Amino acid sequence: MKLGRAGEVLPFSLKSRVEDVPMTNPEELIGAAHAGCFSMALSSLIEEAGKVPGTVETSAKVTLEQREDGFWISEINLITRGSNQDLTSEELVALAEKAKSTCPVSKLYSS
């Protein structure tokens, strides 16, 4: 599968859902898109607040469930870590909450 403007090729396989193989799957790509979008939204909000974003890193844990009617993504949990001396914990949490409502991928999943 080719991704992005540069045409990066990623090995793509059904096996990656259940085995430890060096390939990816749709669920991992969805999680990566959500995590990346959220980090970008949060960094932008930090800059808009007149602060220096520092480091913002987000990872996603995508839960895939098998139900009677097939597989479903039941939830995506984002874990964000950052380093910024300009923000209090309270300010960062408030901006992260706002990022949840401004990140386009978060909007998609909340609709």
Q: Where is each model-derived feature located?
A:
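Extended beta-strand/beta-hairpin segments
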Residues: M1-A32, S39-S111
